[in-house]
Curated annotation (Swiss-Prot):
NCBIfam families: miaA
Enzymatic class: transferase
Binding site for substrate: T15, A16, S17, G18, K19, T20
Annotated source species: Synechococcus sp. (strain CC9605)
Annotated EC: 2.5.1.75
Single GO MF descriptor: tRNA dimethylallyltransferase activity
Residue numbers spanned by region Interaction with substrate tRNA: 38-41
Keyword annotations from UniProtKB, A to Z: ATP-binding, Magnesium, Nucleotide-binding, Transferase, tRNA processing
Reaction(s) catalysed by this chain's protein: adenosine(37) in tRNA + dimethylallyl diphosphate = N(6)-dimethylallyladenosine(37) in tRNA + diphosphate
Alphabetical GO biological process terms: tRNA modification
Cofactor annotation: Mg(2+)
Gene3D superfamilies, sorted: 1.10.20.140, P-loop containing nucleotide triphosphate hydrolases (3.40.50.300)
Name of the molecule in the record: tRNA dimethylallyltransferase
Length: 299
């Protein structure tokens, strides 16, 4: 790839690793907007539970690819790719450099590596049927039909399980057989965060989510879209729903959310290790090291 090609900086790492704070600092130094690559932050009204950049942070630095749809309008990976790629290319035409930030490894890979997701539109009727069956049945179904895809999806992750089954039934092809086309003509610099104190950071983040009003946000979403909304089965929202229903105390909800988040972070780390090759930034002087690497690639 020619060094004259535009530079795309991707900042990746597990949840609660400090991506947002570092992204804001990098964006400020380079006078760049931030492109979101977090799959749950694509949805409006889901702010606290997804740790979406606050209004103050978004006022400080422009953000793109946030709040694309309401939670009852699922965005497929292919749709995200079709929306995001032109936006990034438009920014590259202006500055020749762009900053992507997120913990959704598959979404990052789709953008930077030319991964071609299956062209299967959301199927509301099928999703209703799968929701009625329950995740205890759906995940084993996926394991039997597409074990490679199932191995990458947590048994409790109803959203991704349903999408994999949707692709399987809609196309006749397993999700794991996604094709790869030529990657875009970008130079990609991957910067990774993996702090040693991640467990502590996750616990602090979880407690903060509940203090900030996660339960109230979940209540509003449940009233507007129904408690069976697939996104309300994801980490944090699921436990908040159980609190609302009276089956969990606050202490229990925080503990379970923190535990599930740690498990999710472990899967993220595994994905980044297998699918990406980032420059892992140290826990100290992180911004300094990041800017040194970026400046080397901008020369």
């Amino acid at each position: 790839m020619n060094s004259s090609n535009p530079l795309v900086i991707t900042l990746l790492g597990p949840t609660a690793s400090g991506k947002t704070a570092l992204a804001l600092d990098i964006a400020e130094r380079l006078d760049l907007p931030v492109f979101n690559v977090d799959s749950r932050q694509l949805y409006r009204e889901m702010d606290i539970g997804t740790a979406k950049p606050t209004a103050e942070q978004q006022a400080r630095i422009p953000h793109h690819l946030l709040d694309l749809r309401t939670p009852d309008q699922p965005i497929t990976l292919q749709e995200f790719q079709a929306i995001a790629t032109p936006c990034i290319n438009a920014a590259l035409e202006q500055r020749d450099v762009a900053l992507l930030v997120g913990g959704s490894g598959l979404y990052l890979k789709a953008l930077t590596s030319g991964l071609q997701p299956p062209a299967v539109a959301p199927q509301p009727q099928l999703r209703q049927q799968l929701t009625a069956l329950g995740q205890q049945i759906c995940h084993p179904l996926l394991q039997a039909a597409d074990p490679k895809a199932a191995a990458k999806i947590a048994p409790a992750d109803a959203v991704r399980t349903q999408r994999a089954l949707e692709v399987l039934y809609g196309s006749g092809q397993p999700m794991s057989r996604q094709a790869t086309a030529a990657p875009p003509p970008w130079r990609v610099l991957e910067l990774g965060l993996n702090p040693a104190n991640l467990r502590q950071r996750i616990q602090q983040r979880t407690e903060q989510l509940y203090r900030d009003g996660l339960v109230d946000e979940t209540q509003r979403l449940s009233e507007r879209y129904g408690a069976d909304l697939p996104l309300l089965q994801t980490i944090g929202y699921s436990e908040a729903l159980q609190m609302i229903g009276g089956s969990l105390t606050t202490t229990e909800a925080v503990r379970i959310t923190s535990q599930r988040t740690r498990q999710f972070a472990k899967r993220q780390r595994t994905w980044f290790r297998r699918q990406h090759n980032p420059h892992w930034l140290p826990d100290q002087a992180t911004l300094t090291d990041a800017m040194t690497l970026i400046e080397q690639h901008l020369r």
